[in-house]
């Protein structure tokens, strides 16, 4: 990305922050809080998710067979099935149906897939008036705007903005102001349009292969009207929407509303097995049928391929097809909460999962426009009702985008980037710089303190911003001349009569910059009679993986496995300070290493305070640690630490040691490794961080602590003072 492209991206994000950010943030965060509250009521949330995942895996595996089954079922019911290869094929068929009916108006409800194939434009070209009947979609149609959210397409619009739009466009007798007035006006107008329509079009949340039943999960009743009022019903759905049977709908019905909007159950759950023989009712007098049920009703199920079968054959993108379009990944994403789908989205789809959809359907160029907004924080994986590894899909797509990227000004980092990404193509300069952070850290440490002066000097700041897009408003952490490993090698272990020995993993931040927290970690473990070894081990590969440099991350993972394997094989435990590295050991290494190497390392690696909690639970003396004496602490846990389920260990240990702990509940601090250092994303990063900053200021605690390097850097910029890592509070004085 050139300097000019970075500036355009930054300007676009700033505009959305100013014009849509408040509305998007308020709504998505509300949905996200609702999800937490709603799923907490379930007896077996994880079991439901696993069941739903299993059904989708089976359905996608048997997809050709299920397409045949649903075709037979619909035809037995008297309907027609058409499997469209692509958008043009689907639109041609739908246009033919409209022509056969001599249709002047088609009304639509609940069909994102129809947005994907751009059927509105194609029918408009043929003289068919297409009317969206879902309120949010209709608002956007009137405003001529694109959706900004999978479930709530007009989430970026305020009530005041919608009132202004309606008053200007429709000039009602009395100006519309309240939400009740707006919805009443829309209901009446849409009712008239639906009643006079020739064709009704819906999508489907699910299609059952056994009976040809459509499952529609909606918050409004217009989908039912769209099905029953016109004589012709066209349902448009991707082939991935097929599940084997009606019985398979149960876990999805339990999960979809809770995951998407925080509702225990949505307003309408419709199971339709068309053609519908029920008589059309009058909207003004719903008790009186307009027809006797003997009308010439017909039904067409248009199943869309449009790249999906190729995605099914792609081992990395296949998981995208498990998506049930609930929007949980969007609502849980801190970046999406700030800018919405007009930035974090492509031609049709938005949010974390959109990268997979857009790459598979539209191509890498479209996915590249927003892929970097996924920082890999992993909060979406916990939110997803079918356990899709969304960050991995984004990483894979980023790697594929990199492979087609021309490397600009590579000579500037030649020799500083010993990665495995190949020559003549690969990640751009900015990604390559951050992906090879460990090499830069080694050099910075070797030449400290001169390197610190140079890195934070005004000329260097301007050069790095101009050439590599490193925002000069960020200050680099200071490199330390004596590394943690060097300090420990000279000092040796100081545990008295140790009961066990562990390997303390020297991540690049702790080893080369945040050496004091590493020393505190050593003292903390030794105080609990644990001897510490700090071996020569490279970085985990988190830095290159975050930039989509999978080959480099894989090579690094192998080196780490070779270095730590002997300790693990001898029964040793690996203790990790930086949560993002532990997430690599327990998560991404499963994709980068053979199972025989991944499993032992994953099973024997621990976050440091998690490990301390285990020691205390098994009889270690908490009195050996620092006494908080009732001091108040505001604690922010790292995003990946939360996804791993480890945040509570830190809270518990701090409280056991006498600290009065308040925790934050934001999904991510906004720094996300290198993300907040990048010029084009600085403003977004700080906007995300302000939510955290507000919570920390409101806590008014004596101390602020945070578990990750990114978090401490961001909080330092937000509050003007660097927080401590929990080990620095817990460790006895050295």
Where in the sequence are the language-model features?
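Catalytic cores of enzyme domains
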Residues: 181-352
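N-terminal leader/transition segments
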Residues: 1-123, 134
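Short cysteine clusters
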Residues: 323-329, 333, 374-380, 384, ...
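Extreme N-terminal leader/targeting regions
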Residues: 1-49, 399-402, 406, 415-449, ...
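Flexible, glycine/charged-enriched surface loops at secondary-structure junctions
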Residues: 75, 79-85, 106, 259-272, ...
